[in-house]
Amino acid sequence: MWRLRRAAVACEVCQSLVKHSSGIKGSLPLQKLHLVSRSIYHSHYPTLKLQRPQLRTSFQQFSSLTNLPLRKLKFSPIKYGYQPRRNFWPARLATRLLKLRYLILGSAVGGGYTAKKTFDQWKDMIPDLSEYKWIVPDIVWEIDEYIDFEKIRKALPNSEDLVKLAPDFDKIVESLSLLKDFFTSGSPGETAFRATDHGSESDKHFRKVSDKEKIDQLQEELLHTQLKYQRILERLEKENKELRKLVLQKDDKGIHHRKLKKSLIDMYSEVLDVLSDYDASYNTQDHLPRVVVVGDQSAGKTSVLEMIAQARIFPRGSGEMMTRSPVKVTLSEGPHHVALFKDSSREFDLTKEEDLAALRHEIELRMRKNVKEGCTVSPETISLNVKGPGLQRMVLVDLPGVINTVTSGMAPDTKETIFSISKAYMQNPNAIILCIQDGSVDAERSIVTDLVSQMDPHGRRTIFVLTKVDLAEKNVASPSRIQQIIEGKLFPMKALGYFAVVTGKGNSSESIEAIREYEEEFFQNSKLLKTSMLKAHQVTTRNLSLAVSDCFWKMVRESVEQQADSFKATRFNLETEWKNNYPRLRELDRNELFEKAKNEILDEVISLSQATPKHWEEILQQSLWERVSTHVIENIYLPAAQTMNSGTFNTTVDIKLKQWTDKQLPNKAVEVAWETLQGEFSRFMTEPKGKEHDDIFDKLKEAVKEESIKRHKWNDFAEDSLRVIQHNALEDRSISDKQQWDAAIYFMEEALQARLKDTENAIENMVGPDWKKRWLYWKNRTQEQCVHNETKNELEKMLKCNEEHPAYLASDEITTVRKNLESRGVEVDPSLIKDTWHQVYRRHFLKTALNHCNLCRRGFYYYQRHFVDSELECNDVVLFWRIQRMLAITANTLRQQLTNTEVRRLEKNVKEVLEDFAEDGEKKIKLLTGKRVQLAEDLKKVREIQEKLDAFIEALHQEK
């Protein structure tokens, strides 16, 4: 019995431990188990001695009493037990994953159905547009005929590229494997999952951004390329300008010219070029020898010249005038057959047909350029050098052909102009006249022979050339007539020699070699030679060329030293005149004077940028106030001052200032700044610099100033920025200190006193002199002034009775004044009363405003403390402070625009104007004038001619 009782006690203890044990580990997973379905094991057996059970915080193992009778157990209130040793987390994880899958699948199906339903609803809401298909052009429906969809399909990405765009399922599986740690906050699985998701989104974003970056990069590269070529173009234009300046400044000593040994004929040609310019400038003619080719139109002058030069270098026309200006051709011997112009470095290869065509075209262009508008021919000479093997050294001048009748399309004075040009060249006593006569026409039709006989009646420097002898032999019935011409018996003229030549068959495409062969063949078979009518030395252009060259050099040796002596005497006279008139001045020609003036002008422009900011702001503020003072006082201050209270005054002022700022003020400010810049620029350009001032530059400086100002335009954005700045300045009403208050009062007093002075002068002119001036200066009033004076006195009486009178007279007041004046015998018109009242009231108002301004000197304390005192409402002082502050800020802003931008832009304009003037020779001649300039120009030219003549004479003696 005792043992049974002990066992029952032990069992109750065990049950109580099971019920109340708190040693279950919270981290273990739960499992639902029924108490009946499990065996409870106890650690004590009945065979053992009963001991006191040990209390434990957790049960690792349970045991049961086997000898206890079986009885019905009662269910415990706790229906769940814990099994610490068994872990079922894989099964639980699978269960949760299955639940997540069902959730995702269900959401996808439901979302898809909802989206389809929404799409169908939207589709039903769209109206049926099938009836309006006719509006769409047919080209839209037939677009498949114009677009190759197969090519587009091939351009689309293939399946491999699409696979790359598909989601990475391996990453998805890896993310699902980390769902075990997903439900734990801050776990690594969650971090990895979010990082992966963020990475996929960033990849899509990166692809979008990369495409946009490519487009931006391509646009930027295109812009850089445009800027690059724009800079190259600007650099080339600048280099071109500089090169043109260097060409104009031939005497620039800064450039090292390599000294080349020139041939004798080239040196002589340079002398003739310089003399040609000198003769054209001073309307004189030198006496140096040259071969002058004259003849009737289409007589073959150009063909003879081409045969001598051995190249078809001149433009040709059948019966049409092609030689429109003199062409000076300098022939010299050289290894290559080339031609070049005096003012160009391009060489034309005369052995190539394309170069010959280009040369003929260039000569024609130069001729047309020399011919002025309304003229047919020009006296200006084109200088051409031709070098080649076997050429005779000489200088020939091809003149326009002499005509007998002026045809349609020609200028009326063409015939006289051609005669004057020909006479100018032939009257040179040392010129060799190469008279060309067409042998295929009657001798009686010749015009040039009479002209040549007048210029050289004794024939001491004339060579007669009969052209087209082949045609003459066929057409002329009597061959003796040709013999008479060659012997000088037919024409009334004499010559040193007579020659007969053949210059081709009339085909312009014939080469020089073919013409020479034809000429030699003709004279070998000609009856004229066989019958001794012509001598062998009188035929062919080769013999002609040798004879002309010998005659030319003989004339040169005889006359060149005499010409040099005459230029030495001219130089001595000019130098003596310079020493007597300008003993302390250096001899500067027009180009050198222009460079000196250019440097002075640029220095004056730089000094413009060195003016102090204070100077700029003072003149800007003063000029701006002079421009806007009338508007401020007449249209803003006076209308606002007629109001009854300060609120209405401020409202009126704000409205009028806003309207003024939006419309007129910025434009006025820019105009003032531009006029100020012009004034300062003119002052720096025109003010004398003391004794060193040279008045010879005055016209040039004035022209540069006017042209620079005309080209300069103020920045377009200046008005917009000024409008904002001025509006903000006028919005501010807070005067911070007493010094600003006093400055505003002083500014207001000055403005009102100036207006009061103008009003006093207007009243004085209206009413005439007062009694003092009438007694001292013996002045009287006119009848009208007397009426004005009586009216003024009557109005002043009315103002004394009511000093608070408004600005306008009422009709009954006008009637009262008129009746009072009529009672004193003064007839007055109502309009005269109004005019007089305007000036009288204006003076009264300005005096009252000045007195009020004086009272406001002690009103800053009331203004600062916002006291309300009707006697010291100084709103007008605040208005003038706002105006003064706006003027200061505007002047500061305009000064910054001037010094930072506009002065530099003006300097750039001045440089461009000077560069343009430097390239315009006529402009320099017009602006740099005077005896001193002309004398320096003469000295320079004569010295250059004499130096070249001396060098040529020295080379000529060495050749002997």
Curated annotation (Swiss-Prot):
User: Its gene?
Assistant: OPA1
- Activity regulation remarks: Activated by guanine nucleotide exchange factor RCC1L.
Q: Which domain of life is it from?
A: Eukaryota
- An annotated GO cellular component: mitochondrial inner membrane
Q: Where is this region: G2 motif?
A: 321-324
What transmembrane ranges does the database entry give? 97-113
Catalyzed chemical reaction(s): GTP + H2O = GDP + phosphate + H(+)
Region annotated Stalk region sits at 589-836, 874-928
Q: What is this protein called?
A: Dynamin-like GTPase OPA1, mitochondrial
What organism does the UniProt record list as the source? Pongo abelii (Sumatran orangutan)
Q: What does this protein do?
A: Dynamin-related GTPase that is essential for normal mitochondrial morphology by mediating fusion of the mitochondrial inner membranes, regulating cristae morphology and maintaining respiratory chain function. Exists in two forms: the transmembrane, long form (Dynamin-like GTPase OPA1, long form; L-OPA1), which is tethered to the inner mitochondrial membrane, and the short soluble form (Dynamin-like GTPase OPA1, short form; S-OPA1), which results from proteolytic cleavage and localizes in the intermembrane space.
Keyword presence, Metal-binding = yes
The annotated subunit structure for this chain is: Oligomeric complex consisting of membrane-bound and soluble forms of OPA1. Interacts with RCC1L; RCC1L acts as a guanine nucleotide exchange factor (GEF) for OPA1 by exchanging bound GDP for free GTP. Interacts with CHCHD3 and IMMT; these interactions occur preferentially with soluble OPA1 forms. Interacts with PRELID1.
Q: Return the annotated region ranges for G5 motif.
A: 501-504
**Gene Ontology process terms (BP):** apoptotic process; endocytosis; GTP metabolic process; intracellular distribution of mitochondria; membrane tubulation; mitochondrial fission; mitochondrial fusion; mitochondrial genome maintenance
Keywords, ordered alphabetically: Acetylation, Apoptosis, Coiled coil, Disulfide bond, GTP-binding, Hydrolase, Lipid-binding, Magnesium, Membrane, Metal-binding, Mitochondrion, Mitochondrion inner membrane, Nucleotide-binding, Transit peptide, Transmembrane, Transmembrane helix
Q: Which family does it belong to?
A: Belongs to the TRAFAC class dynamin-like GTPase superfamily. Dynamin/Fzo/YdjA family.
